[in-house]
């Protein structure tokens, strides 16, 4: 993030972003080692990941602010920014003490704005203080940052025993994310937009309209519909759609572990004529179902 409240691109600070990415890379390499039967490789990168996790939790967590922050030369920045949610993108945090950070996505003085999640907390005196068109991440809404936060949020809801966020919070933020991607009545995604009126900032610049750096499809597949990636032969589906919001949906032709996956939700059974409820099919064969829109685990079906 080029220009931010915690420090711009030229400041060599320790941030939740890069350190979380390194943790994710190390964990991925460790898992690759396990998959190929290379115990030495798996252990090497697992130890690297563990070391990074310890440093992130010890050095970047502000216990007073209840948030992961940027570490300047010797002190934390003292500002909550959306990058503080990226540790959950890789399931890095390992204690409930960090859960309170997620309360800020529902707080209008935190990150909650009429058109989505801001890149910095709205209560901060330097919010939106860097001007416009200067690559500033000081509050305006960036689809890239929103994508990261929503992925982290889905992980937090799915992978942690927590009572702070419900599927309705995720669903509403996804609605805002989708609704914001229009300009002059046509589908559009640019660099960033105003958090209050939804106008795209610098929308007439060529580079902005080619700035499709969100992860829209992944948010729909793994978050909203809820196909949760796993290493084993089990399919896990947990739609983050509140009861009563959608009566039907179909996610089809998803290549997963070399198989064609279909996920159907048909509340009354009269939309797709495959029966009532939530159904999972692998290569056209039914492998699991439930009457309600809820978590469904289909073991050893791949």
Question: Language-model features: where?
Answer:
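Aromatic- and acidic-residue-enriched carbohydrate-binding clefts of CAZyme catalytic domains
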Residues: 1-12
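Polysaccharide-binding and catalytic clefts of secreted carbohydrate-active enzymes
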Residues: 10-18, 62
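C-terminal beta-sandwich/jelly-roll accessory domains of carbohydrate-active enzymes
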Residues: 247, 254-260, 264-302
């Amino acid at each position: 993030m080029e220009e931010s409240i915690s420090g711009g691109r030229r400041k060599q600070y320790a941030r939740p972003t890069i350190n979380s990415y390194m943790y994710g890379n190390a964990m991925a390499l460790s898992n690759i080692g396990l998959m190929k039967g290379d115990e030495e490789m798996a252990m090497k990168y697992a130890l690297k990941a563990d070391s990074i996790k310890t440093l992130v939790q010890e050095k970047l967590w502000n216990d007073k602010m209840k948030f992961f922050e940027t570490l300047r030369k010797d002190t934390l920045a003292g500002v909550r920014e959306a990058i503080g949610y990226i540790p959950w993108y890789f399931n890095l945090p390992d204690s409930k003490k960090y859960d309170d950070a997620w309360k800020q996505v529902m707080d209008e003085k935190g990150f909650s704005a009429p058109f989505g999640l801001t890149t910095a907390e709205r209560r901060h005196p330097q919010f939106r203080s860097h001007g416009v068109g200067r690559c500033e991440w000081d509050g305006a809404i960036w689809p890239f940052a929103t994508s990261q936060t929503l992925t982290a949020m889905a992980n937090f809801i799915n992978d942690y025993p927590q009572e702070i966020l419900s599927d309705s919070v995720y669903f509403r933020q996804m609605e805002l994310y989708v609704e914001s991607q229009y300009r002059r009545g046509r589908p559009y995604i640019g660099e960033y937009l105003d958090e209050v009126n939804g106008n795209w900032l610098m929308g007439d610049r060529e580079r902005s309209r080619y700035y499709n750096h969100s992860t829209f499809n992944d948010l729909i597949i793994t978050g909203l519909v809820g196909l949760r990636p796993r290493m084993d032969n089990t399919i896990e589906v947990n739609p983050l759609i509140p009861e009563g919001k959608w009566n039907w949906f179909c996610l089809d032709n998803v290549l997963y572990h070399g198989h064609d996956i279909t996920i159907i939700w048909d509340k009354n059974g009269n939309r797709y004529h495959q029966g009532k409820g939530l159904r999972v099919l692998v290569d056209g064969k039914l492998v699991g179902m439930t009457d309600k829109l809820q978590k469904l685990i289909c073991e050893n079906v791949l």
